[in-house]
């Protein structure tokens, strides 16, 4: 006989406590501890195996290396982020803001997957008629797609066991409920238990399962943090509502590389792949304008060029204002301090703004030099050449430090018509002779050297 006990669980991080806290000891958030009733098995009750059959032990040397079989989604950018396709028996979590396109990309993938595989689409948010309307708009006409409007996890798991579909899509995990848990749908306990059941089902029958997840106000997957540890792959769908572009980013992948991205454009017909993101990021760049510089960052194995815009104006307040969009604010403040101390460019009476065009977020330190160039270009009202690109990490001593994949970055710049590349001095030796002949490559050691190497006109 199961006993009932109450626990207070944080809705943000999943921290559990026997008493209520105003501030969660785990994540520090306020008013996130919610009371939930848990079922606990009484002492002496035989613990079930959870549906797992005991298996004989195997030595590592006895295990054969089977080539993993991947299933292509038919969307090249999607396959890139997944590591080459869908792995059998994997559990993939896809998160993103409401209306960003999570359900859209999965439904579009069903059109190609349905040519050779059967797909079960489980919806807890929409009716079958609503899904049909959206499928018609996206041009999804496959007969291998089956719709199930259900939220009970036990019923869904039984359907998977009996029907044996090749691929399962759960939309969304926050609407699923497990009848052995008394809390409401979307609670920490419900999300955790439902995910465990889907993981068990995926591994037992070798069926890949996609799980759609909502995000909280901070942009993280809503529910316990352990949710991301349970699944095999975590994908984030990012994008600003004011932009038509969407970025699919992989942050965890047990079967491929992480930090890969796929770029899409949202249209009336659905999501379209952007095969050349660099060209898209640089489209519409102003001519002969100060305060703009092109950066080259690595997103996984792909070099991407992005325009960084800086604006420096006289402040109207006692304390200068700093604002950054698409670039870390604290790192921007550090770069301004380095420019003042090491290069003699003073911003103490100036407001400074940084914007990365097209909604891209630059997390790599290699973007430091481009951000610094954009700020100084605006400060001095000097125009950086249209065909000039710069990348490199800036240290606190004002030095330009080496970055990885330098040759790939320079090759991408040359392919898009750039003529001059300002790069870290320590990366220059690793470049091939052909690249050095094709492009005007300027190696620099310090911030001062970088600005003196620029061709600018005031």
For each feature predicted by the language model, list its residue ranges.
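Conserved RecA-like ASCE P-loop NTPase motor core of nucleic-acid helicases/translocases
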Residues: 119-123
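P-loop (Walker A) phosphate-binding loop of NTP-binding proteins
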Residues: 97, 124
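Peripheral, non-AAA+ core regions of ATP-driven protein-machinery
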Residues: 2-12, 16-80, 87-93, 100-110, ...
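Divalent metal-dependent catalytic cores for phosphoryl transfer on phosphate-bearing substrates
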Residues: 128
